[in-house]
């Protein structure tokens, strides 16, 4: 394994350095080839490194930042006033080549905007998308995007997400001819928003894509598709709902029947069943797949949940390591170029044509 360097926005997220710095030390313990640049307030970071040994400290560097982008800041305003912030400094380290990837639990909109501004999208990609690989009940994986980078998506963006998701499934997850579906409120062709229906019409015409139609949210964990595409609003709500249900289920496994008097053999049986079921469903624990990759950029950026705990943030760091090792941006760009040698131009949907015509008619004099 070759050495690699990551930039961490340790000030981002709900808990800031109290979670991100211990997670950084945990990541260093599990990867001897990793170097971390901790971007943030040195006065807040330094005390949390008191337990770090000499070897860990040799692979750590504090990069001072003057401010933090608030989680509730409007993205446009946050970007305008971002100079000197921990998030921007971390991204600039990637842009300058001092780090190979960035990890942040900060404001999603600001991270999306700054990453697009500083690292630039892959040629032909309109907007990057947040993507993650979720486990499903068949013990396989499903690539899901967008998870919140773009609240409103037109049909062209959805088609681009589908192509990028399929490439990721092939090049990184190792799937052959991955099935691609659009998340919708029903499987019938006339169901859903016009953007979804128009995207479906275009996806059917792409011979390089194994498009299988619509999928409903209750089938997310069934393994019926390899790539699931949706707008960022729907994807974010769907993901967090799923995570909440899984956390509740795992919590019930641990606490069911507590406080009730039972015979010793029933208690032993209950504990055995709880441990067995917990192991069986542990792969669904949201902490184990924290970290969404901002797909479509020329550099690697990982967005962690804002509410991530130490374990979850360390998983996001590992996601960044894998993104660098697997050369995700480079492989996505190369695959798109091979699929579309004349340029990544997609057929226009009816709504996109109408929208362009209306903007031309209603333009400024």
UniProtKB/Swiss-Prot annotation:
Subcellular location: Cytoplasm
One GO process term, biological-process aspect: phospholipid biosynthetic process
Record's GO cellular component terms: cytoplasm
Keyword Transferase: yes
Family annotation (SUPFAM superfamilies): Isocitrate/Isopropylmalate dehydrogenase-like
MF-aspect GO terms: phosphate:acyl-[acyl carrier protein] acyltransferase activity
Pathway given in the UniProt record: Lipid metabolism; phospholipid metabolism
Enzyme Commission (EC) number: 2.3.1.274
Transmembrane region(s): none
EC category name: transferase
Keywords annotated in UniProt: Cytoplasm, Lipid biosynthesis, Lipid metabolism, Phospholipid biosynthesis, Phospholipid metabolism, Transferase
InterPro entries the record matches: FA_synthesis (IPR003664), Phospholipid_synth_PlsX-like (IPR012281)
Reactions catalysed, as given in the entry: a fatty acyl-[ACP] + phosphate = an acyl phosphate + holo-[ACP]
Gene3D superfamilies for this protein: Isopropylmalate Dehydrogenase
Family from the record: Belongs to the PlsX family.
Subunit structure: Homodimer. Probably interacts with PlsY.
UniProt function note: Catalyzes the reversible formation of acyl-phosphate (acyl-PO(4)) from acyl-[acyl-carrier-protein] (acyl-ACP). This enzyme utilizes acyl-ACP as fatty acyl donor, but not acyl-CoA.
Protein name, as recorded: Phosphate acyltransferase
Organism: Klebsiella pneumoniae (strain 342)
